[in-house]
Amino acid sequence: VFANSTLLPANGLNFGWGSYSPGGIISGKVVFVLEYENGDHYKFFIEKYQAGYTFKYAKWNGTSWEATQTRTIANGTDDAFFNYFSFDSGAKVENLEPSKSAWDLMFTRYYTFFNGQMMYRMAGVLQSPNVSVAYVRPETQGTSTFSAPAAASYSKTISTIGHSWKPTIGAPHADAVYYIKEGSTYYRLYFTTNG
């Protein structure tokens, strides 16, 4: 499996890198080759997810793959939503994000499967699992009165805002508004410039 890669068909049991199986285990099915700006290449395979991630990786030395390393990172070992790992050190990286309760939105660059064709690096906004977001378009941005969207409009998907606030090139959409719900508190967000 580690030497073969395939894209899984889209359905409710596939997670992009693996398939859900009875018993709550996601088993890996896809091998990724990661290319870094410095020219390093790593082969990466998530073997399974069950209360944490078990994965394999190997570095390309210019002529062949080095010895395969296997690691397991358990969830819940620190106060963070994400697990971080360094191929350079071969270990989990601690304390790279604020505590779970200390953030709502992360403005960052991330990769998405753009237009169902390819992985594409985007600039956008990811949300904490502590909030839900509703996207309304068209809506007047600069207004002193508004009505919050219906409860069913809110999503916990991490990339609800994502890159949808702007076209691939140019200024943000002038008629897009996001409602962010945290508990019983609502925030209204819209973008006015890009860059």
Regions found by a protein language model. Name each.
Residues V1-G195:
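Surface-exposed, beta-sheet-biased, low-hydrophobicity segments with strongly acidic/polar composition
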